[in-house]
Amino acid sequence: RRYIRKFKKEENFILMDFFCHGVPSMLMWKKYIKEVKKTIGKITYLSWRNKVINCHDMKTMIIDNEKIDWHDSYNLLVKGEKGYYNSRLSQGDVFYRLFLSDTCLGKACYEKCKFKYDRSSADIRIGDLWGRMYKHNEDGVSAAVAFTQRGWELLHECNLEIVEHSFDVVAEGQMKEMPICDELYKRMKILLQRDDLDINQIYRQLLIALKYRKVMNRLKHPVRTMKNILKKIGK
């Protein structure tokens, strides 16, 4: 926005950004692709958030028309010379498990991201509307936030069904702050750089580290831990 404002062109643009969890680190992505290639050979096609699976026609990918639940939008389809590989978070795919652990994001996500949650330089922000409000909606609901009057006017000029909610509802499932660059992140970076470890071995190391962190956190807060135990027993 500062750039177009500098040249007095701001009125010629509508700026849009996205609710963003982060981007996977290149180290993690390369490690994952290396593992996938063992199954399907050289990769020739890749579709992020693929909504349709086809097990038969590798050209169109849509013969079976198996609709993917929008809640399962963490979904990646990779086509290779020997077949295809469908990666879904709901099926426990290691790529998404690592990504959502916030320990394997790109460096800039930890150091330079200024636009989490309600911070933006755009007129409009879009994304998926996660959260309790539409938890049982099977068709999918898009979130659109107008940060400026121009953004608000444009949204209402579009041929859309608009239901207004508070920002807290719209952004309920979104990250509020940058992820923390802690010791676990540094540890994962070292593991991802090792040629002798595949991505599944690295994920197992992460699980061990997370379990250790959970136990230590409980030991550091015995009163809170006991209250939680009693609450579970009470149920």
Model-derived segments and their meaning:
Residues G22-Y32, H56-D57:
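Short, charged, surface-exposed secondary-structure boundary motifs
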Residues K6-F18, T39-I40:
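A short alpha->loop->secondary-structure connector
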Residues K34-K38:
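Acidic, Ser/Thr-rich peripheral helices and adjacent loops at domain boundaries
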